[in-house]
Amino acid sequence: TLVHADPSWPAIIARVAASGGIDVTPEALVAAERSIAPEIARRFAAGERHTSSLPTSEAFWTWVYDGLLSECGVDAGARPAIAHECHVAFNDFASWRAFTDTAPLLEALDLRRAEGLHVGVLSNWESWLEPLLVHMGIASHFDALTVSGEVALEKPDAGIFDHALAAAGLDRSTAHLAVHVGDSWSADVAGARGVGIAPVWLDRERRGAPDRLASTTTIRTLADLPALIDAGLVKA
């Protein structure tokens, strides 16, 4: 929602592979991701949570990278080392950049924080998210950070939303006063709605809501958010 792999996750993996003498293209990796996506979804549906600790994160992501490389035809003997180096690369702060609409949003929300608005991060991320945000110079814009790698719960689990509500001085009985913005329909929209928080779906890629019957506030850019909040147009 706020940051992205720079220049892109396929480009980073292709670069790491090239450093090991393996030629894979970003386009091939995107196609490979579509192939392994059903298995990733199955594992999530079965309750697997991959950011709850650094060891589980490494195990999950190296499995993902190995699967992507396998789909691209990389030899089994070469894959483990490349998958490990991919994990190292994505843990490097230099691999991440804030979206162009992040800074303007945070500046706009700072004005509202001065009037009493609580602004927090609720993220499925490893425990190094806060140092990353400090490195990017944006951590000071938030009143609280609720990170799956620190609380050992992941969206859409209700418990992590309870942690975020508590950080804002709220609970389930006052959850309707909160707004949660995210770019994952299952983790963010469904998860927030499940505990009574008003969801806003950030659909940068204009994918369209998968649940056509659900009335959900949708934005294409974070720049649209402050006006919606000010107008009270976001409903639980």
What does each of the following model-derived ranges do?
Residues T1-T100, P104, E115:
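N-terminal helical cap/lid subdomain that shapes the substrate entry/recognition surface
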